[in-house]
Structures are given as structure tokens and as C-alpha cells.
Amino acid sequence: MKYYLIAGEASGDLHGCNLMRALLSLDPEADIRFWGGDRMSSVAEGAPHAHITQVRHIRDLAFMGFIEVLSHLSTVLGNIKFCKSDILNFHPDVVVFIDYPGFNLKIAKFTHSHGFRNVYYISPQIWAWKKGRIRPMRRDLDGLCYILPTEQKFYSENSFPQAFYVGHPLLDEVERYRTSENHNTVKSSKPVIALLPGSRKQELKRVLPAMLHLAKNHCEYQFTIAGMRLIGEDLYRQIITENIDNVTVVYDCTYDLLASSYAAIVCSGTATLETGLFRVPQVVCYQCNRLSAAIARVFIASRIKYISLINLIDDSPVICELIQGDYNYERLEKEFGKITVDKEAREDILSGYDRVIGLLGGTGASQRTATKIIEIANGK
């Protein structure tokens, strides 16, 4: 069968990679065109009988916040136009949307109007920001595979019969890492503090400076940045303007870093849950453009209490969230002490992680999603 997959961010690339593997295990001769990153493109190497083509790379797609999207509007609109044309030319049996809602929901409306079957993997967080989108999603999607147990109530209450809970794919990814032998953990004579400043250039520029300030005042720890070559090594060098003896950067090996870490400072996103699955106490941070933040407060803040996946899933403040103005050196220093020297605080966080892991259930999300996609592609 023919599959068209669209992922627009680093987390989507990770989940898309695992989904492609699962699809190929069920359909070894699949014909796949995709928007994604290096992880998704690497799947082709182990699939000699499949036909896999990358259309666009995520480095050209990941824009964060209302203002950033507007400033790249011509690029976004150009990508939408090209995507529509490419789908029509390819004529897939099913279109699979992986997160990335601002772009993907527009394409879903188009593909539905042209008679294609649509499956959305990793539900847009409409329960937090745009409940009005539930109606067009019901219309445009043949299947919606959501990954958070807390979303079940929302889709049940909003009469969305084609929504299915598949479990969280990060459980599969972390389990795969733990059972593999290809580990390259970070070596240090000091306790390692992981710095995860995000997967977008805008995030990196905003959150990394305070992390570096913290490191300069804590020479008793080794601070290691989870770098991404996708962003470009030059940008890290531009931000790290002085030589700090206890700061290093490792690239594209976040799990090796987390497996070696005593604590972490993490930019909000998928990485907060990954850090929790590795049971590393963390402080979560987030900063965006001021106007973007003001718009978000109007549309989102009144609907949700937390921004990190750990807190959202447990519906409690398991980990500290430092957002916008609260993310400054003084607050970070205070919360850093709690996750490093306060044994009771660390134990409370680890207990919260255990609750979250229990709520997520078991592994197998990618395989369940692939099975559902093939069923829908076959008209079942």
C-alpha cells in the first residue's frame, strides 16, 4: 500500500521513525513518502523491499509560537501548497499526520475533500487550546490515535468515535534503548546535570543562557548539554560565548546523557517525559516571544494547569515549571537546589514518575497505531 506521512518536528521524527518500522513489519513492500528528519530517513536502510522517499526535512519546518510562524509565513504557505500538490500526484491509500497540528490540520481538510483516508497520530492538544477544532477533526479524520490516558475522557465526552488510545510511543523508544547494547554514556568524575534546551533555535536562544549561568556557579557538577546537529553546532558556539570548564555539549545522544544524569534542566516538550522515564529529577523551563505568550495566556492558560507532560498526566505538580518571567537565574538556582541536595524533594519527584509510568501502561504504541492505519487504509 501507499502511505504519506507528515512529521514537522524532532519529536514527530522520533515517533514517525518507530511508526514506519511498525508499518513495514506489517507491510514490507510499502510505498512511503514522508516529511520528517534523519530518524525517519534512516528506516529506509533496513527496508530493502520497501520504497521510501523523503519529501521535506524538518529543519525547514519547525517554527515555534504565533509570531515566529507569522515571520515565516511565506515559507509555511509555500510548504502547504507543495504538500497538497505532492499528495495529489502520489495518490496514497492513507495520509498519516504526526502531531504538528498548525500545518497538518490544514492538509487534513484538503485531503478529506479529495477523498483520501486520513489518520492523525498523536492528537493535537485541542483540549488545551482550540476545542472548536473538534468538529472539523471529526469531519476530516477517519482515525485519531491519541497517546495520553488523560485524553480519553475528552474524546468520549465530545463524541469522537474514531478516536483510539494506543499508548505512549516513548515507552517503546526508552525500552529499545535499555535493551540495546549500543550505549555511550557520559563519563565524569562529578555528578552529571543534563541540560536539555529544546529542539528549536528559538528555544535554545531563550533558555540556554540561564542554564549556563547556573553552571558557572556550581563547579561541583558536570553540566552537559543535549545538543542537536539539526539545529547546527555553530548556534551552540554562538550562545556559549565563554569557556566554562564544567560545561560540555554532546550531540544526538540524549538518552545516553539521561542514563548518566543525576538531575536535569529541561525545556518543556517531549523531553520532559523522556527525562521522567529515565527517572531523573528535573526542573522544566519555557520562554517564548512576549506577544506569543500573551496570546497563549488568553487561549490556553484558562484551560490547563500545567505545561509539562509529567504534570499533565499525573494532574499534579510533580515537577517545578518555570515559565516566561518565572524562568530566571534566581528561581532556577532555588529549584536546582531542591532537585540536587533536597533528598525528600527528589524522592517525591521519583514517586510521581512512578505514578505517571503506571498511568501510561505498557509498550506497543507504534505497533497498535500501524495496525489501525492499515485497517483504515483497507476501509475497515
List where the protein language model places each region.
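Nucleotide-activated sugar donor-binding and catalytic core shared by glycosyltransferases
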Residues: 1-380
